[in-house]
């Protein structure tokens, strides 16, 4: 059948029909279920409500834009390093995020703010949806270059649901604290993508090996992503934190942790680099692990030193992961991890979760004072000891790994459905499969400006 | 005369003298008329004024930076797609915006805040000036590559005045609501530029056709502009909206609309694409129309579903416009629209205005409650019915199209003045006409690092 | 000895060991001395403290992100113009800033917030540390391409200390006002770097001349830096200014000054350009001097006209500096200034300091009213006359130039230590010395997608 006209037409229509179906279904669900919440609806909001308590909410607004910038500019450009896959990297980032934002508004709405037959949305819904889109884009990094856009939309369809359930179980059923999402975003997104990539393992991928590297200017584009992730990570971790000490502490810890992971990354990259030379892949990725590793604990009393130590550890572990573990992951575990999400999100996410276990276990009424209520409400209310909170945090990590692994496995099976359009082994990491691509250089017909011409214009 | 030394000197001096004259004249007018307003002047502001009402003002501050980012990064980089016109695209964006900001501060100041013989400026003046600069840059997109910098400055000189008057007529005389500027910014900027481009029609433009496309990495630079426009559009539409439900609703509606226009664009681009392949031009532009189409109505009770539907419609219409209408626009209507502003701003702007007519016509006291005063003050005060407001909105669109068309026509005649420097037909879309341009590649003399050399350094 | 295996190993280990040592030492000092301040510590912050006075603090949060964006995106990408040094430009920006942030937190902490045996850190510490990192990156611009990363870290180690002391002397001992840092950041950073570059003078640098220019797309990357600096400069100058009129005025003055410097730059660039063509180097740099020149005075009652005049002057002087003075600086004064920091930060910084002298000398109780206390507290309290404040401002400039020159000289001697790794004259401006660099173009083995292949995928 392959190559027959009808099949080709079917394949050509896959993406448009799926987009139209998903957008149509989402729109119908929005029409039936989604309503503005009381802080967004004209009729429910009153100027007289404008109190300090509401102030808290207004401050969210700039944070939302910071998170938004981080997800789109950051994740989008971090993936353009491939020499012939830049269109797909930023383009599919856009596509996936645009769908994930809508779909997770619905999923999270049903889980968290469904009452009176309606989901109630506001600025917080946007931030939560952006977080979920972040997890989907992390998974995208693992399968980058080896999947078509229709496959990716189906991946997002499944992953958004499991992300929402996992987050609900952790935050609401288990009382786990994870403000910046070391577990819910990074660990979940990374292992979901890695297991999925394992199921989609391509033994013949070396046919596309010559396209798997970067070129000089694609690495510079990638640094745009890196820098935006680096600068906005303090806002990302603090985006849903209540105003005041907690938000300041979260930003400060994240900032210190990133600074230390950067120095750790440079040290290790030069140490293990051929002839002492630095590797751009390490700087682009491992330097960011400081943001991941304090995702769970940045709101806690981690101390500035604790933030530095955590960031440094993450940066070094991640760099070593790129150098030594990624090749093993492919050769022994048959996991082809295009962007190295295991090193940027997987290991640092797990480390971050464990750091959260440790810091939670050390929490005392003395160290947190009145702030205990906002950081560990269940301890403050006497429902849990610090040790019990630590155990719950650990169990949360376990749950996340389960959801991610089972979900990634299911996702892999879904994406293997034979009628789905997937690039052949010899055409992975290649924009031309999905895009009309212009040449790399300007038209050869172009001539330099000649003096006669310059003189004759009107 | 052409080619004679004196003429060449005259042409060389055109840009510097115009810059110096415009800057000098602006500075004199600033010296005579512009003063800090009471929220900016040291002597007029008192700490005791620091009330909730003022809070509203402080919150503007981050929004100002968001709008600023959107106008400069967004519009600047959205136009670098041309393979040999990147310097001019970002450079002239800078030049035009820097002049438009000053000039529109004066024009808008005379129209809106002139009392006691002075214009009073503050943070709101900056946001309003940025909006006006946005409209000028939209018009720039229509004539991109076919006009010199001196011509562009003259275009801005005229357009800023007409923008100010049109906005004044709509918002102050007609009581039209247009928070995000579907009419005042997008429709006005697009049709001003399109009519101007019509007057400047070049029948021989195919002489520069080989330079009219993009190259691989120029398309990636363009995606920087796209992403920044996408992420900051919620702030752009909400920048001048009062705090509270209205601002949240504006951001939320814009966000949903953009998500839907993105999915609609991918669907249609793949559907009409050759061999089912996506076209980067569609993604770079049509995916943004969700922000344009809710410009008038995003503050209204559009409902989340309404935002999705509007965005989807705009994305699909815009994509179809790029595919089918832009060629007709050139061949039949003799409008050469370099960036396709008709598809990104023109049609979506008109659609957005009509959507505003519809949503305004459906406004009820029930749906808006206490919020009616801030969204439709004239309806709330009983001076107008919803239907009457809708009619005023429609008339506002008509006025905008008139101002834009007549203004664009006048602008075209102005730019055709024979002594103005304009690139010849064979040198359109070419940086070398205006800039000292380095080569595309590093010096051929460069040699790879040899081992002996590496070993001999101190 | 050169070229011997042991020496090569020693050189290879320099960067990793220095990174590890500096990170280790910083971490120990953090462990001993650094604590959260009362607005960041869970136990010290109380919800009941949430007053208007605190509000002031919360508003800092978005400004922090703006400053952060400006320092990293702005300075990082402004330096990628060199055709073969993009990795080092953004990479070492990252490295230097990550170290400077930590180290200046300690240095500034000891000088400003050391009590009870501890340094107390919060959001303001982050902004102050970012400012210091900015100065270090300015100095980096002077020596860009001619120094290795270990040398740069040592430079930062010294510069951060002197930056902190100079700032302390100016702001706390002399009562100098310098909100946006014309003196403390720009003048200090520039002359520190220039004197250092003088000490490191390389008579044989023409061996690397062929690598010293830009290529077409590296100039576009640089424009990313330029635009981010331009848009966030109002926030940068206003970041540590108290809320209210002062902050608005600072932003407004900076905005006007930048607009005028942009027009002045275009005018002069076209005027002095070969054949009337614009030079991208001028636009990338001189257009930004409007932000530098009002660094000292933007919070003062400069008036909108004053801001325009100052910006215009800075833009023209800076453009002329690039054209005429930079070559003399190298040939006569033996200062090799890679990025032209003398034109972007040096001269405009000194001009900004002198403008501050003038505006301070003209201060009257009438013009400032109640705002005098926040702008010139010592004049408001009657401890100083306006003339005396002006003299102190002038003396502050003198002190800054002293600290910068002596510091830069010491720094140069430090960096000349013979065992430090430095690129040879023939390998300056070359990434390959420090990085594993991929090719400029995609693998030649890559073939276009053939139809048979496209048809055979699963």
Swiss-Prot record, chains A, B, C:
What family does the Swiss-Prot or TrEMBL record give for this protein? Belongs to the ammonium transporter (TC 2.A.49) family. Rh subfamily.
Q: How is it modified after translation?
A: N-glycosylated.
Cite the GO molecular-function annotations of the record.
ammonium channel activity; ankyrin binding; carbon dioxide transmembrane transporter activity
Q: Keywords in UniProt for this one?
A: Ammonia transport, Cell membrane, Glycoprotein, Membrane, Transmembrane, Transmembrane helix, Transport
Among InterPro entries, the record links this protein to: Ammonium/urea_transptr (IPR029020), NH4_transpt_AmtB-like_dom (IPR024041), RhesusRHD (IPR002229)
Topology Extracellular: residue spans: 35-61, 108-124, 171-178, 241-251, 304, 368-393
Q: Catalytic activity, per the record?
A: NH4(+)(in) = NH4(+)(out); methylamine(out) = methylamine(in); CO2(out) = CO2(in)
One CC-aspect GO term: basolateral plasma membrane
What is the organism of origin for this protein? Answer: Gorilla gorilla gorilla (Western lowland gorilla)
Which compartment or compartments is the protein found in? Cell membrane; Basolateral cell membrane
Q: Which residues are glycosylated?
A: 49
Keyword match Transmembrane: yes
Q: Where is the short sequence motif Basolateral sorting signal located?
A: 429-432
The stretches that face the Cytoplasmic side, renumbered to this chain, are 1-13, 83-86, 146-149, 202-219, 273-282, 326-346, 415-458
| Biological function | Ammonium transporter involved in the maintenance of acid-base homeostasis. Transports ammonium and its related derivative methylammonium across the basolateral plasma membrane of epithelial cells likely contributing to renal transepithelial ammonia transport and ammonia metabolism. May transport either NH4(+) or NH3 ammonia species predominantly mediating an electrogenic NH4(+) transport. May act as a CO2 channel providing for renal acid secretion.
TM region(s), chain numbering: 14-34, 62-82, 87-107, 125-145, 150-170, 179-201, 220-240, 252-272, 283-303, 305-325, 347-367, 394-414
GO BP terms in the entry: ammonium homeostasis; ammonium transmembrane transport; transepithelial ammonium transport
Which gene produces this protein? RHBG
Q: Where is this region: Interaction with ANK3?
A: 416-424
Q: What is its main location?
A: membrane
**Name used for this protein in its record:** Ammonium transporter Rh type B
Q: Which Gene3D superfamilies match?
A: Ammonium transporter AmtB like domains
């Amino acid at each position: 059948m392959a190559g027959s006209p009808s099949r080709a037409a079917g394949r050509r229509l896959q993406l448009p029909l799926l987009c139209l179906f998903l957008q149509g279904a989402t729109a119908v669900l929005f029409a039936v279920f989604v309503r503005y919440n009381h802080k967004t609806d004209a009729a429910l909001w009153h100027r007289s409500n404008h109190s300090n308590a509401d102030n808290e909410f207004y401050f969210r607004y700039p944070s939302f834009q910071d998170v938004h910038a981080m997800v789109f500019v950051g994740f989008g450009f971090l993936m353009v390093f491939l020499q012939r896959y830049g269109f797909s990297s930023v383009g599919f980032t856009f596509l996936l995020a645009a769908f994930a934002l809508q779909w997770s508004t619905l999923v999270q709405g049903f889980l968290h703010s469904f009452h009176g037959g309606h989901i109630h949305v506001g600025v917080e819904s946007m931030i939560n949806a952006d977080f979920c889109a972040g997890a989907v884009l992390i998974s995208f990094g693992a399968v980058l270059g080896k999947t078509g856009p229709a496959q990716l939309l189906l991946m997002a369809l499944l992953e958004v649901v499991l992300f929402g359930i996992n987050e609900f179980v952790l935050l609401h059923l288990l009382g786990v604290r994870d403000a910046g999402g070391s577990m819910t975003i990074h660990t979940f997104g990374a292992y979901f993508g890695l297991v999925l990539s394992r199921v989609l393992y391509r033994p013949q991928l070396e046919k596309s090996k010559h396209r798997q590297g970067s070129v000089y200017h694609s690495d510079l584009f990638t640094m745009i992503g890196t820098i935006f992730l680096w600068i906005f990570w303090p806002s990302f971790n603090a985006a849903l934190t209540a105003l005041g000490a907690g938000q300041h502490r979260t930003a400060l810890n994240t900032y210190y942790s990133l600074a230390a992971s950067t120095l750790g990354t440079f040290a290790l990259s030069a140490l293990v680099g051929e002839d002492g030379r630095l590797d751009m892949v390490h700087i682009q990725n491992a330097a960011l692990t400081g943001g991941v590793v304090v995702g769970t604990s940045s709101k806690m009393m981690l101390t500035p030193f604790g933030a530095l130590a955590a960031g440094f550890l993450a940066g070094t572990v991640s760099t070593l992961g790129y150098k030594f573990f990624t090749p093993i992951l492919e050769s022994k575990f048959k996991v082809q991890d295009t962007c190295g999400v295991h090193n940027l999100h997987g290991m640092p996410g797990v480390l971050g979760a464990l750091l959260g276990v440790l810091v939670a276990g050390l929490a005392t009424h003395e160290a947190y004072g009145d702030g205990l209520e906002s950081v560990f409400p269940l301890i403050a209310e006497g429902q849990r000891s610090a040790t019990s909170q630590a155990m719950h945090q650990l169990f949360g990590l376990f749950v996340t790994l389960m959801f991610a692994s089972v979900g990634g496995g299911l996702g892999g099976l879904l994406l293997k459905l034979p009628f789905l359009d997937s690039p052949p082994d010899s055409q992975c990491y290649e924009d031309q499969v999905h895009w009309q691509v212009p040449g790399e250089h300007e038209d050869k017909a172009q001539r330099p400006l000649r003096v006669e011409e310059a003189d004759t214009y009107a």
